[in-house]
Amino acid sequence: MKLAAPSLALLLSTATLVSGAWNRRSRSCGGVLRDPPGKIFNSDGPQKDCVWTIKVKPHFHVVLAIPPLNLSCGKEYVELLDGPPGSEIIGKICGGISLVFRSSSNIATIKYLRTSGQRASPFHIYYYADPEGPLQFPYFDRQTIIATEKNIP
């Protein structure tokens, strides 16, 4: 039997790294999410502000994988908080490159905010749990995320 091409093997390896039970999806405007992995979708409902708090088991960190966003900067954006609601805002994002962020604890919060009259632009964010210990791959740090805030009020 002939083996698959190297690119196919790489694709299968990548799929294995991100595999999981993706039946946990949140299309609601906010809430507390547990038991990763999961996927957050924004809502086009009447709510202007949505807050999702992700809590994973103790001795784990929350990892957020954010594909490139295409939000209307100045009218809508996503805030990342390193901890529960009320924690320090570590970044505001409305567009740009993909980001992967690892929280400093087992809690992270995502806020989606938009101005009145602004229709919600679709986006999604993946969340995972990562055990405490050395980083397994590079994550964006606070300074990198702040650099994406230039056009956000």
UniProtKB/Swiss-Prot annotation:
Modified how: Partial N-acetylation differentiates isoforms AWN-1 (not acetylated) and AWN-2 (acetylated).
Region feature Heparin-binding, mapped onto this chain: 93-130
Superkingdom in the source lineage: Eukaryota
Keywords: Acetylation, Disulfide bond, Fertilization, Heparin-binding, Secreted, Signal
Annotated signal sequence range: 1-20
GO CC terms, sorted: extracellular region
CDD domains: CUB
GO terms assigned for molecular function: heparin binding
BP terms from Gene Ontology: single fertilization
The keyword Signal appears for this protein: yes
Record localization: Secreted
Family annotation (InterPro entries): CUB_dom (IPR000859), Sperma_CUB_dom_sf (IPR035914), Spermadhesin (IPR000124)
All residue ranges annotated as the CUB domain in the record: 29-130
Cystine pairings recorded for this chain: C29-C50, C73-C94
Modified residues (N-acetylalanine): A21
Family label: Belongs to the spermadhesin family.
Stated role: AWN proteins mediate the binding of boar spermatozoa to component(s) of the egg's zona pellucida by a carbohydrate-binding mechanism. Awn proteins are secretory components of the male accessory glands being coated to the sperm surface at the time of ejaculation. They possess as well heparin-, serine-protease-inhibitor-binding capability.
Protein name (record): Carbohydrate-binding protein AWN
